[in-house]
Regions:
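Positively charged n-region of N-terminal signal peptides that target proteins for export
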Residues: 1-4
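Active-site and adjacent substrate-binding regions of carbohydrate-active enzymes
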Residues: 21-576
Length: 576
């Protein structure tokens, strides 16, 4: 086992395995794995303890008015289906007014629903309908930039100083000594104002100004974080939160949460988010926030209830290590049937974040999202996807599903890059597949008028077909979500102890514990039979298989498991 992982495993007093042949994974445990059943619940809304989130991309979920674009009324009409999955919360991508150069993340009015989605009253009614079904709803909050068409930015372009002049990061001149080191992040010659503005993603998304952690005295345009104009911007962004919380949403997913304060090591940005947390706790107690930061230990210290673990090294080892799935590096995903992946590298990175964040908040490992290729790609089958769901729904923290993954919607290739959907993002934002009618039931318009093309393959999955099949992926996902929602050992904060994880080997096994309630989860994505064994530090009751397929043998405190190719097994191994 790699040395860095040994440090992580030893820190939970578990074990080191002796490596053996690739196809014979039975190993000789050295010491007992320490499972205590103790766990500390972070400060978080109580409903998050069992939460399973379902991400809906509004423009491609359901078109209720026949214009080819999904809308809020369409989501309302499909809430009974969402509820039937067993999920407890919904995350909605941006529905604000926008020119849609970046699919709505380029906002022109934070206080108004874009007409293509409906009205503010539709949003308020959607929130109420979600609550009526016993679910919660969070919305995307985009604090780091706006569209160049936003009235604030247009006002900041005026050469005459005004309220908005410093709400965006502008230099004092278009040409100045030392400008070369800034040019890569700034846009020149856009308007009559003499200066360059910083962009925070695409060029047309100017960065809102939260100040500089360490302003350069030679560059007076680098304002400190407590500058009066910056404080005014921060208060306005709090007003945006107030507006939507008053409308009925339960919280926010914070886009690019770590990219606010410039020249920052993260500490100043964290300080800002702590002030936001204090304001929310005072005025809107129980508000849930999840960051797009990808450094959970930093994000939860900043007051977030959770943070996504998906952008950086470690996550790719699970589902998208290959270059065909990402543009960063090459390798083998652990959750592929070829069975060439390595779970230890994921654990090395994940455990480093987990141990430093678990007492303060949660890690959210997403199945996918609007920026990631769908998990069903490059030959993965429904059987492969079921193993992924078993893993994701039994890990600690808050699971986030992406719409359509529950039926195995595929990543589509070679689609036009509309609204900024570059880097493979076009293929993961296609319309939801409801039935076998034209456009898979998403819309009644002719196909050429669709916002995005739908999967027209003969074997394209759909909800209605899978509803009829008790063995379908959809129904298996429902069973796993039900398990997640009812087992005390699967609460978000329940103990997590890896018990079988060897470099380049399968399966991966771990225990979730809450008091004397213990579950052993074993996943085998590889297309071969595998087995493994380990020793427990406690005397357990007779193991019982409660989900999946596999065999288990208990000899005193030693447990041995065996799994078929591409399978998972969940056993109850409660303490006596």
């Amino acid at each position: 086992m790699i040395k860095k992982l040994v440090v992580s495993i030893v820190s939970i007093a578990c074990f080191i395995f002796i490596g053996q042949a690739q196809d014979a994974a039975i190993t000789s445990p050295k010491t007992a794995c320490i499972v205590t059943g103790k766990a500390q619940r972070p400060v978080s809304p109580a409903w998050v303890d069992k939460a399973v989130f379902y991400q809906i991309y509004p423009q491609t979920y359901y078109d209720s008015n026949g214009d080819g674009v999904g809308d809020l009324q369409g989501i309302i009409e499909k809430l009974d289906y969402v509820k039937s999955l067993g999920v407890t919360a919904i995350w909605l991508n941006p529905f604000y007014e926008s020119p849609f150069r970046d699919a709505g993340y380029d906002v022109t009015d934070f206080y108004k629903v874009a007409p293509r989605y409906g009205t503010n009253n539709d949003a308020k009614r959607l929130f109420a309908e979600v609550h009526k079904r016993g679910m919660h709803v969070i919305i995307d909050y985009v604090p780091s930039y706006t569209s160049i068409d936003h009235p604030w930015f247009k006002a900041s372009c005026d050469p005459k100083p005004n309220k908005y002049s410093n709400w965006y990061v502008w230099t004092n001149s278009t040409w100045f000594p030392g400008m070369d080191k800034y040019k890569a992040d700034f846009i020149q010659g856009y308007c009559e104002r003499d200066g360059m503005f910083m962009n925070n993603f695409f060029w047309h998304q100017p960065a809102l100004n939260y100040g500089y952690a360490k302003p350069d005295p030679q560059q007076p345009w680098q304002l400190p974080t407590n500058h009066p104009d910056i404080m005014a911007l921060k208060e306005e962004m709090k007003n945006v939160m107030r507006f939507w919380l008053n409308m009925g949403c339960d919280g926010f997913r914070i886009d690019m949460a770590g990219s606010l304060v410039k020249k920052d090591d993260g500490s100043e940005t964290s300080k800002y988010w702590k002030t936001v947390r204090e304001f929310l706790d005072k005025e809107y107690p129980g508000t849930f926030t999840v960051a797009e930061w990808s450094y959970p230990k930093d994000a939860v210290r900043g007051g977030f209830n959770a943070d996504f673990f998906h952008w950086f090294n470690g996550y790719d080892d699970l589902f998208q290590k290959e270059k065909i799935r990402n543009s960063n590096h090459d390798g083998h995903s652990y959750f592929d049937s070829e069975g060439k992946g390595d779970i230890t590298h994921f654990l090395e990175v994940y455990l480093d974040q987990y141990y430093d964040s678990r007492d303060n908040g949660y890690i959210a490992v997403p199945f996918g999202n609007h920026d990631l290729v769908r998990i069903k790609n490059n030959g993965r089958t429904d059987k492969d996807i079921a193993v992924i769901f078993a893993f994701m729904l039994t890990m600690p923290g808050t699971p986030f599903m992406y719409y359509g993954d529950e039926i195995g919607m595929r990543q589509l290739e070679d689609l036009p890059h509309i609204e900024g959907s570059y880097m493979g993002r076009a293929g993961d934002r296609t319309p939801m597949q409801w039935n076998n009618a034209p456009n898979k039931g998403f819309s009644v318009v002719s196909p050429e008028k669709l916002y995005r093309a739908v999967d027209v393959s003969n074997d394209a999955p759909d909800v209605v077909s899978q509803e009829k099949d008790p063995n379908s992926l959809l129904n298996r996902v429902r069973e796993l979500i039900k398990l997640h929602n009812t087992e005390p050992a699967l609460l978000a904060y329940a103990e997590f102890v890896p018990v079988y994880a060897e470099k380049d080997k399968y399966p991966f096994a771990y225990i979730r514990g809450n008091g004397k309630d213990r579950l052993l989860i074993v996943v085998n994505p590889a297309n071969r039979e595998v087995s493994g064994s380990f020793i427990l530090n406690y005397k357990c009751q007779k193991p019982k298989l409660i989900s999946g397929k596999g065999t288990i043998l208990l000899e005193e405190n030693k447990i041995s498991v065996n799994l078929e190719p591409v399978s998972y097994a969940i056993f109850r191994i409660n303490e006596v």
